[in-house]
Amino acid sequence: MNYFTLNKHSRASRFNMIKHKRSLHQPESFPAPLKRKNFNTMRIKFPLLLLLIPFFWGCKHEKLDNKPLISVSIEPLRNIVEHLAGDYYKVVTLTPVGASPETYEPTPKQLMDVSNSKLYFAIGTLGFEKQQLERMKETAPTLKIYTVSDGISLLSVQHEGHGDSTDPHIWMSPKNVVQMARNVCNALCQNDPEHTAVYKKKLADLERHADETDRRIRLMVSKVRYRNFLIYHPALAYFANEYGFRQLTIEQDGKEPSSEHLATIISEAKAAEVHIIFLQREFKGRSVKSFSEATGARVVIINPLAYRWDNEAIATAKALAAQCI
């Protein structure tokens, strides 16, 4: 046996000994080839799961999108209709956030949504409604249109910006909201009698919430001394009438006031001890700054077209109550 052969056998023996020692520390149940195989399988399945997620997600949303449509004019009305019918209908608003319902022109897509709707709920006195309702009847003859202001005593405003001198912001009074909801509920029960019990239960819930909102507002404004306020666009006639306030309007015939009108309103505001000026979010109201500087009144931004009509009414009451502080 030569040196090479001897070293060959020695090296083999040492290798076998090392291999034996390693095997004592390595669990038999974890063979390397099996681990690699499972990893490869996971690499195949994981992308497959990613591909399937949109399918299941799409199925879920397809089910939601298959709800029949109801169209409404403004966001506060969508709040009411969704509370009553949201379980069975998808509710869409014709006037987007930030747009004026007095002058807004619906887009072709919005008019398409209206034509595909089962029902349409209108305030009945908004500027764009007067222009668009007749067109809706022509393009969608099967569409059923309901006016939610039925049964509500409409109030006049100080200028002609609302057409028939009528303030359309009926939802700024919680009591009016109750009547609006009752009108919606009656229409839903007529067209979907199968769910009458649900609609009436939801109506009762909304009535309780409106009553609680009214109670909170009365409590907040009960000790307010200054009962007059300025507002750029006359949107709080129903709120003022309900809670014992008087609104003075800056806007003249739907436009910025003339210098003569400006001077008259400033004089009247000073005499009436006005301490607050409301400015709606969708209006620029360039003259409001002049009124504020001339009268010392604080400017408060409001959004009567907000989805949460209740929060907006309470925020208005808080602003009026803060005059006492």
Question: What positions do the PLM features span?
Answer:
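Low-complexity, intrinsically disordered or signal/transmembrane-proximal segments
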Residues: 3, 9, 20, 25-26
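Short hydrophobic targeting helices and cationic amphipathic motifs
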Residues: 3-4, 26, 31, 39
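Intrinsically disordered, low-complexity segments enriched in serine/proline and basic residues
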Residues: 6-8, 15, 33-36
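N-terminal leader/targeting signatures
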Residues: 11, 26, 34-35, 51-52, ...
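Extracytoplasmic metal-acquisition and chelation regions
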Residues: 59-325
